[in-house]
């Protein structure tokens, strides 16, 4: 079994959401085998910013969906989407 790297975009529910706090909560999510390799806060438009993560996880059915679901439960998160995924 290999690993996959996912590029994940996390959009806040409002421009006033503290993205550093949201990012810390994301980093505190405990899922076996999931490792955040890189993270950044990127400007989108009109003062809106998003968190972009590079996460590595086992190539197992459903683990990416469960991780996305956990991120979506964080207060201040509007949406979570996978922008890119590749096998390692």
Swiss-Prot record:
It holds the Pfam family EF1_GNE. Keywords: Elongation factor, Protein biosynthesis. It comes from Archaeoglobus fulgidus (strain ATCC 49558 / DSM 4304 / JCM 9628 / NBRC 100126 / VC-16). InterPro entries: eEF-1beta-like_sf (IPR036219), EF1B_bsu/dsu_GNE (IPR014038), Transl_elong_EF1B/ribsomal_bS6 (IPR014717), Transl_elong_EF1B_B_arc (IPR004542). HAMAP family: EF1_beta. CDD domains: EF1B. SUPFAM superfamilies: eEF-1beta-like. The gene is ef1b. Belongs to the EF-1-beta/EF-1-delta family. Promotes the exchange of GDP for GTP in EF-1-alpha/GDP, thus allowing the regeneration of EF-1-alpha/GTP that could then be used to form the ternary complex EF-1-alpha/GTP/AAtRNA. It comes from the Archaea. This is Elongation factor 1-beta. Transmembrane segments: none annotated. One of its GO terms (molecular function) is translation elongation factor activity.
């Amino acid at each position: 079994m290999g690993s996959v790297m996912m590029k994940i975009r996390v959009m806040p529910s409002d421009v006033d959401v503290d993205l550093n706090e949201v990012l810390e909560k994301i980093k505190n999510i405990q899922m076996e085998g999931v490792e955040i390799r890189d993270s950044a806060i990127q400007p989108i438009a009109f003062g809106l910013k998003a968190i972009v993560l590079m996460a590595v996880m086992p190539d197992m059915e459903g683990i990416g969906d469960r991780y996305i679901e956990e991120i979506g439960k964080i207060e201040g998160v509007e949406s979570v989407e996978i922008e890119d995924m590749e096998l390692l």
